[in-house]
Amino acid sequence: MRSKVTGAKRWVVKIGSALLTADGKGLDRGAMAVWVEQMVALREAGVELVLVSSGAVAAGMSQLGWTTRPSAMNELQAAASLGQMRLVQAWESSFGEHGKHTAQILLTHDDLSDRKRYLNARSTLRTLVDLGVVPVINENDTVVTDEIRFGDNDTLAALVANLVEADLLVILTDRDGMFDADPRNNPEAQLIYEARADDPSLDAVAGGTGGALGRGGMQTKLRAARLAARSGAHTIIIGGRIERVLDRLKAGERLGTLLSPERGMLAARKQWLAGHLQTRGTLVLDAGAVQALRQANKSLLPVGVKTVQGSFRRGEMVVCVGPDGIEVARGLANYSALEAQKIIGQPSDAIESILGYSAEPELVHRDNLVLV
């Protein structure tokens, strides 16, 4: 089972507030430096990495001399605004010592619920990762409201794992993993090393709330693992203060709690595509494109499309039919119907000259395509 960790090519690492602060007295630069050293080693080993970092509110509280996390939204947002600057500067400085750059991305629930903004965020993250930059993601606490907040960065990290199609979500916390009883009260409590994310028995042992500086307890981490599992990602809940924790995970050590999805990534994603989205338009393909989809598992390129029917936006589901009108596949369009009308029948390298930009070389990528 741990081969799923050692073989994972794309990690989302989430670090909680309790780990990032020095007893509530500002950011723990020493601890951050140790994690950065390990994350740089992961990058150099070929692992694509996205960091979800808590700590903005906690850092701001320290600057303001507050010892208790405020409940008023305006005070939380003020602390986040002050602390976010220091948090990002600390990450950039630490990664910079190893010749790596970071990029700040602040998200709200609206960014991931709106399909167009979701696709734009995914495209930006993929580009940053391809460039060797480490994206540092946090919730945009300064502008978010109760109605649209993620609630905790565990949930945000799971949604980011879905967004970037990560193989592995690593949630670093102040506990060594999930136990079959509360280890703070029961010295006989045993660490749960491996389980299915959807195992209902886990709910009984995941009680409890977050600490003074954060919002997420073990129950939120379990929910995050289940959310990540929807796209086929594995989740490890593990103690962030374990020595060389990321190095040892990569080496295959049996640490923390590994929660596995029911299905593999591609199977989970394609089941979701097949059953959960309403179709908005139709693409009529030529015989060559039909053969490429059915026999070679290829993406659908504009050159293989003869006509566009219906009205759809980027990211919406379209039906792909052959010259005989029989449905071949369905998938998510990378371009709107109006844009698709302009580029069909054309080679992919002509997209930019026709539209003035190029979002993707494919009209529908094979990972977003389900054969029927």
Swiss-Prot record:
Residue sites binding ATP per the record:
K14, T173, D174
In short, the EC number is: 2.7.2.11
List this protein's GO terms for biological process: L-proline biosynthetic process
Which terms are listed as keywords in the entry? Amino-acid biosynthesis, ATP-binding, Cytoplasm, Kinase, Nucleotide-binding, Proline biosynthesis, Transferase
Q: Identify the main location.
A: cytoplasm
Any one GO molecular function term: RNA binding
A GO cellular component entry from the record: cytosol
Residue ranges of domain PUA in the record: 280-358
Write down the chemical reaction(s) this protein catalyses. Answer: L-glutamate + ATP = L-glutamyl 5-phosphate + ADP
Give the superkingdom in one word: Bacteria
Q: Which residues form a coiled coil?
A: none
What's a Pfam family this protein contains?
Answer: PUA
Its pathway, per UniProt, is: Amino-acid biosynthesis; L-proline biosynthesis; L-glutamate 5-semialdehyde from L-glutamate: step 1/2
Q: Where in the cell is it found?
A: Cytoplasm
Q: Where does substrate bind?
A: S54, D141, N153
- Give the matching InterPro entries: AceGlu_kinase-like_sf (IPR036393), Asp/Glu/Uridylate_kinase (IPR001048), G5K_ProB (IPR041739), Glu/AcGlu_kinase (IPR001057), Glu_5kinase (IPR011529), Glu_5kinase/COase_Synthase (IPR005715), Glutamate_5-kinase_CS (IPR019797), PUA (IPR002478)
What does this gene product do? Catalyzes the transfer of a phosphate group to glutamate to form L-glutamate 5-phosphate.
Protein family according to the UniProt entry:
Belongs to the glutamate 5-kinase family.
PANTHER family this protein is in? GLUTAMATE 5-KINASE (PTHR43654), ISOPENTENYL PHOSPHATE KINASE (PTHR43654:SF1)
Q: What is this protein called?
A: Glutamate 5-kinase
Q: Which organism is it from?
A: Pseudomonas putida (strain GB-1)
Organism lineage: Bacteria, Pseudomonadati, Pseudomonadota, Gammaproteobacteria, Pseudomonadales
